[in-house]
Design a protein with these regions (language model features):
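A short, contiguous, amphipathic alpha-helix enriched in charged residues
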Residues: 125-133
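N-terminal accessory segment detector
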Residues: 1-98, 107-124, 139-153, 160-170
Length: 170
């Protein structure tokens, strides 16, 4: 058997990835909806955030472990992307002097918008902050724009965390 016999076309790979992402979006949506329906909006949303934070921090710790194994420092440029690049159309842009990632194709958000509940979907986006917290808490992901907030695209930037300086005793 030739290697080419095991290859699939890029279009078919993308179709399959998007189908899997669509199902993941539905799964998240219906878990989130069930939690808020059963526990009430406030308690349900709190529990969703708790789960998303735990999930994201796990991903971040795994990325940190991989960076450590390769002898890399835990800086944003060494955080491995965990998104299938075929499914998310991203570009690097510079806005106000800082490098950001702008995402035009957002498979998960598109499903949540179609389901009519962008607010519950938006809670999932906090996974990015949790991933960086797990990878290196000295940095944070910031969503400067998000389609689930009504923006035309999603835009993210990684920034150093600003620590509050304790006031000295007088």
């Amino acid at each position: 058997m030739k290697d080419s016999d095991n290859m699939i076309a890029k279009d078919e790979a993308l179709r399959q990835i998007r189908l899997g992402l669509r199902r993941a979006a539905f799964l998240y949506h219906f878990f989130a909806k069930t939690l808020t329906d059963e526990l009430g909006e406030s308690q349900g949303r709190d529990l969703i955030r708790k789960a998303i934070d735990a999930y994201g921090e796990h991903i971040g710790r795994e990325a940190r472990r991989r960076a450590d194994e390769r002898g890399l420092s835990p800086t944003p440029e060494n955080f491995e992307s965990d998104l299938p690049t075929l499914a998310w159309e991203m570009e690097r842009v510079v806005v106000d002097g800082e490098e950001r990632v702008r995402v035009q194709q957002r498979p998960l958000a598109e499903e949540w918008l179609a389901l009519g509940e962008p607010g519950k979907g938006r809670l999932y986006c906090f996974v990015d902050q949790a991933k960086m917290q797990g990878f290196n808490p000295d940095y944070e992901y910031v969503h400067t724009r998000n389609v689930l907030d009504g923006d035309p695209y999603c835009e993210l930037v990684v920034r150093p965390v600003k620590r509050k300086v304790p006031e000295s005793a007088s």
